[in-house]
Amino acid sequence: MPATILKSTASSKTLLIIKFDTNSSRYPFYKKHLLELNSESTFLGLLTKGQADTSITRLNQDDVRLFEKAKTVADRTKDVAYSFSDPILSTQLRTPPPQPTSIRYLYFGTYRIKPWYTSPYPEEYSCAKNLYICESCLKYMNSDHVLQRHKMKCSWSYPPGDEIYRDKNISIFEVDGQRQPIYCQNLCLLAKMFLHSKMLYYDVEPFLFYVLTEFDGQECKVIGYFSKEKRSASDYNVSCILTLPIYQRRGYGVFLIDFSYLLTQVEGKLGSPEKPLSDLGLVTYRSYWKMRVAKALLEITTPISINAIAKSTSMVCDDVISTLESLSVFKYDPLKKKYVLQLKRDELENVYKAWNIKHPQRVNPKLLRWTPYLGEEQISNLLLKENILIPLPQKRLLDNSHHLDSV
């Protein structure tokens, strides 16, 4: 018998004992285990007991204390890194946290700028201490000598797109990401150095880029830009927006926001920036929304409604409602059991005047020379609407009738 089952009764409890026959050939593993335990060596003689001793690997109080200390330091460092908001929509300069990047300085024209974040430039450029970028074509180089030689041959004096707006020395160019992918990719890589949340670098074909420039007498200098999808399923009128740090705190960020809503108004749509917004971006947009809604409430002569305000401002209804609440004019009437607008004209005028004093740089709609982007499907629908094209089923019917007549 390889094993014997014994029963032992003690204090009303039955103990089941299984006794193995170590000499049985049916349980060789058990015999090997007993030999290993009784021998002076372990692991079948490969290691001595001293070498196989694992007692020194057990955690003690010092190990636990050091681990907790290191964990606390790591958590504190992570919290500091995430406590800074993304400056993607703000016109105010904010000192960013230090980032693990090899590029110490960015040379852009006559300016030396310290990058805020890491940008995925090719390795030979991202490992360099300094990065040099041409102000005209945004080509990046890793030495000043290469930049100077490039300037001798670079013939660009403005972005490679259509100039759709000009007011004195301020211009805005519309650049198609599909037609000018290299320029748009360079623009995105430059923007990533100052935008923490930007994830788009190379897939630029589905986007249109609106580049804000300032003419200095010789060429148009890039100030900032915003991008938008050619076909947005969520009615976003801004995907990404940036004012370069050297041009911040001059009102250009609000200028770009105002221009994006002007394009939305020309399209006959309602628009909103892509969510989520950064802290500073939300503050900037809310300030702009207050001005737009206050102006609309002062000018609307027809019965006021959420849809009427949205149509007047080109803002989506959700943004209009949140702005009305921030203006303290959207309140609930417990007697009528519905929401009502309680307008105070003097307060609305103060909001509008204060915003105009702080932001004198405004977009002039009369200077816009632009038509909305039309895709192939939209062009076909437009031509069909104008009876220029014949619908496909009707065209086949005409072709068949012509064939029968010829027979």
From Swiss-Prot:
Its EC number is 2.3.1.48. GO terms for biological process: DNA damage response; heterochromatin boundary formation; heterochromatin formation; regulation of transcription by RNA polymerase II. Residues 98-372 form the MYST-type HAT domain. Coiled coil: none annotated. It is found in: Cytoplasm; Nucleus. It catalyses: L-lysyl-[protein] + acetyl-CoA = N(6)-acetyl-L-lysyl-[protein] + CoA + H(+). The modification N6-acetyllysine is found at K198. One of its GO terms (molecular function) is transcription coregulator activity. Keywords: Acetylation, Chromatin regulator, Cytoplasm, DNA damage, Metal-binding, Nucleus, Transferase, Zinc, Zinc-finger. It is an enzyme of class 2 (transferase). Its main location: cytoplasm. Autoacetylation at Lys-198 is required for proper function. The active site is at E274 (proton donor/acceptor). Acetyl-CoA binds at I241, L242, T243, Q248, R249, R250, G251, Y252, G253, V254, S278, S287. Component of the mst2 complex composed of at least eaf6, mst2, nto1, pdp3, ptf1, ptf2 and tfg3. Belongs to the MYST (SAS/MOZ) family. This is Histone acetyltransferase mst2. The lineage of its organism: Eukaryota, Fungi, Dikarya, Ascomycota, Taphrinomycotina. The gene is mst2.
